[in-house]
């Protein structure tokens, strides 16, 4: 009983799972009792039967759906709507093993059409991926485009991708004899695609897929790859026209190639296609030695003449009469219309009166056979017209049998074989196309079947196999082919960019979801195509995950793309199978894609635009583009704004420590404050703190605040002149009381309000924030030179006090707004009465040495004279943005930005004029530089405002001329450019003496090594001869002082002045006299006074002593104090006579 129970259990396992489930649901006792044991044994074996049902279900489903899984996987990789319907219907009718092979063959013959191209590139491994094809190398390039070797990622199949231009390149039409009716490149592409879509034969190169994106200027034809390349018949270093033999192939190899070409050509002629360019270069050999015909660019679909488009086809036929290779032209093509009279041709037997027929391919086969046998062309010439004449008139010539037998390549067996080869060539290269050999006659020729007929009779197995091959070759293949028809409409719509196929299909269907909405982690987006109802085929892209495209009802006619994954697979096809079949297929495809991703790092892949630059896959700057894209979105770079699509990323650092527009590096500590990057609070784009960002986002130039009046933030040396005319900031924005400064604190994260008014706040990424972040104070910030000897200045250091306040106010936070705008504007924020802003400021006292040195070099704005007594100079709001609390660019503060009195300036560096304590006998109060100096400056003249009077001093004045030409004992304290030319034609104009007072005082106290003003006058612009001179003696006397009075050259200077007077008076005696001199200034006791300020009366009192001390020289001193005027010769002689008297 136990054995029988076991046998019954074995029988239960063999029951199909679907039938077993139905039997259990039905509950019919009669059917169950036939295969179930007795009641007593059934209770004992209930657990065993339950476990066996699961095993039976899995085993039966695996066996029955093995072929279905393969077919379903192939179906999901197709991309044309008609293919899905065709395969689904064939599988639904006969879901058997034989039908699956048939459908696989039919699906293999179908050409995929893709109108969405995705190109990615890995700059590290130099790997390019076009949709699902990985580009390996270049196979070659020719007239119509390049050919690339690629590998299908899913099927691991090697393919050849032919890249052709969508539009014909513009050519020069000058001095050319090209007919306007010549076939265009675009028509060749359309013709080739339309023909290859219909042709599916063993000896014809298979078109696998057409990648045709309207955005790209290139069309990619994915072709079958022939690993052994084209047929070679001459040495590679020799041109075809210069080849003289022998051939590179033997007679037997040539015979096998000929048989493959004849079979492929027979198929094409049966389909009504004239190849028109049969030659060895268009014959490719696959890895197994199969010969395949390629390049249908100039082919002619002759079957279209029977359609309604016959008139249009006739025009197309006339356009394509003389295309191809001239050396392989048939005689009727060379003659044209004369061929009808010469060969007595009837137009009814040809194509609508044209000389084009199938016979031109037969002639080309004969020329190809001649090249393969003898290694040279039958007719050749350097000129095309002479070549045509030879093709029509010259007889065919052959080398002798001894020459062929002597070479070690041909390997001809006997002379009879050679004669058979000559006979075949004579029949193929018949001048008259009506007498030329046909394809059935070629197949039965003795030379073609020579190896079939000369097999040793001893080997019966070999004999039987060879006989079978001969019968298969010589049989008529027309019964095995299905005729195709290529109409004019199909030629136009062969390329989707030319016809209306996309526009028509879009009206009937809804395309897939736009790839831009998908995840950015996948670098190859799924190919989007026009789809009909019931279509669930997609082209799988690299790195994509296949799962669950669920088809909607037939009434909806669209796909469900709402799942989380990128690509969905239809699990509800027209197949009757188990539910786990689709999941098995999904796992297999995912496994293949995961292997591919593991082998190649997908993180380095960069999407390339499909344009004219990168579409050829050979751009010279593809690496630069890819590296730039990787640098923008690289996670290693620490770019915090990379996730925000609307914010452009910027480099992490710029030159000279200046801050970029967007702060990109957040993890690298700044040199000025190595602990501050740990803070989690930062400024938003509005200028306020935001706890949700850990990086500092600067406003771009298009989002400037009102403080800079729309001016861009520049860091160049022209900032001083660019920001001179900025409007004055209101007092309410620039004034901050001292009590407010003491309450100024770094805000806590909890007290920071969120920028609700910022429209871009929702698009910015939020980061977690650590509460109560402590920031230790920095005692000695790096790269800041603070004079330790000056204790009073160190207490008021703006940078140091800023960190001290940060340390003291970490518990009492208050929100404040950093003032944006000009880098140099309002450093101290304490200017109330200045109407302009200057970058050249001066410090007015000794107690503010450190602050004054800082403001004189790197700050701007209008600093008041009592800035040393004001404690509000280092407030945080008035600091520039780079010195803010959360500035990410502390390296912007360099040593040259914070100078002190002992700083060593660069060689010959022009520094601004500074207020200094003048220690001289004059006891002059040094006037300060007015804040309006820069606003009143001009490009044509250099003006230095001295004193509060605001007198202007031109560098081409007489005082500078005298200073530059007069000899001095000590080192010259001023530097003058070489462009200043002082000659007799220079206009000399008298000026006030207050200008000279300042320079003279500065010259005594400031040697060249000390930081002082270096005056460089410009080239004199006015060079006009005149008799008006200045009171040169007054200038020399005043400028000389005691040192110059003791100089031996003092008299020489006075004497040279007299000579100048004589020269001017003698040569220009008839000119207009000058204005009468001032008699008051002519007196000896005359004093030089200043008319501008009461505080400068001391100048007049101190300078009056020069007139009293000048009594020693008598009459000479009296003449020098007189105002200069034009003198006659008589007056000069009289003065000389008087001076000569004792």
Curated annotation (Swiss-Prot):
Positions with a binding annotation for ATP: 139-147, 162
Record field: compositional bias (Basic and acidic residues): 742-751, 1096-1111, 1133-1142
Region (Disordered): 22-41, 82-107, 634-678, 694-799, 825-875, 919-971, 1005-1027, 1066-1142
Catalytic residues of the enzyme: 277
Catalytic activity: L-seryl-[protein] + ATP = O-phospho-L-seryl-[protein] + ADP + H(+); L-threonyl-[protein] + ATP = O-phospho-L-threonyl-[protein] + ADP + H(+)
Compartment annotation: Cytoplasm
Modified residues (Phosphothreonine): 43
UniProt feature, compositional bias: Polar residues: 82-93, 640-656, 707-741, 785-799, 958-971
Positions bearing Phosphoserine: 964, 1126
Signal peptide (residue range): none
Keyword terms of this UniProt record: ATP-binding, Cytoplasm, Kinase, Nucleotide-binding, Phosphoprotein, Serine/threonine-protein kinase, Transferase
UniProt GO molecular function: ATP binding; protein kinase activity; protein serine kinase activity; protein serine/threonine kinase activity
Domain of life: Eukaryota
Domain notes: The kinase domain is not sufficient by themself for proper function and that the non-conserved N-terminal and C-terminal domains are critical for the biological activity. The C-terminus promotes interaction of ELM1 and TOS3 kinases with SNF1.
Entry function: Serine/threonine-protein kinase that phosphorylates SNF1, the catalytic subunit of the SNF1 kinase complex. Acts as an activator of the SNF1 kinase complex and controls its nuclear localization upon glucose and nitrogen depletion. Also required for SNF1 kinase activation under other stress conditions like alkaline pH or presence of cadmium.
Note: Present with 752 molecules/cell in log phase SD medium.
Stated name of the protein: SNF1-activating kinase 1
Species: Saccharomyces cerevisiae (strain ATCC 204508 / S288c) (Baker's yeast)
